[in-house]
Amino acid sequence: MTRGEKVCAFIKAYCKIPAGAHVGQPIKLMKFQKQFILDVYDNPHGTSRAYLSVARKNGKSALIAAVVLAHLVGPEAKQNSQIISGARSRDQASLVFKLAEKMIRLSPELSKIVRIVPSQKMLIGLICNVEYKAISAESGTAHGLSPSLAILDEIGQVRGPHDAFIEAIETAQSVKVQAAAKIKKPLN
C-alpha cells in the first residue's frame, strides 16, 4: 500500500461521520477527497504545500479532521511530533478540533488511544505522543511551534500580501526536513 492508500484505509476503518443525518457511520471518501489524499501523500517528488478548495458543504473540514487523526494515531503518526490547525478567529480555528473530537468519541478504538483536552483545544495521540492543537491569530500562539503538519483554514480572508500569523506557521513548518503536507483551505 502507498502512503495515500494507508491514509484512506485508516479513515475508512476508524473515522466516523461526526454530524448530520449519517452521524456515527463510517466515512466514505468522495472521489475528490480520495484523489486529494493520494495526490498529497503519493507525490513522488514530495508535497510541502497542498490546497483544497471546494464549495461549502462538501466535507472539507471533516476530511481535514480525519487527516489530522491519521497523523495523530494513524499511519502518518511520528514519535513526539506536533500538528496544528490555525485560522483567523478562535471559532473557525476550533472547527477542525471539534470535528476530530467527535470522530474520536464515536470510535471505540480511537477513544482508547487519544486524550482530549477540550479547554486547550488539544488532542494527544498516546501511541507516539503526538500533539495536535487548534490555534488562532487572535490568541497569538503561532510563534515557537515546530509542526510536522500545519493546516491553515480560510486563507481567503487574508487581506494584502503579508500575514504575520500565516507567515509564523509557514516559517515554523519549513524547518522540518520531511514535512508531510501543509494543507490550506481557502475561503469559499
Task: Name each model-derived stretch.
Residues 1-188:
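Phosphate/NTP-binding elements of NTP-utilizing enzymes
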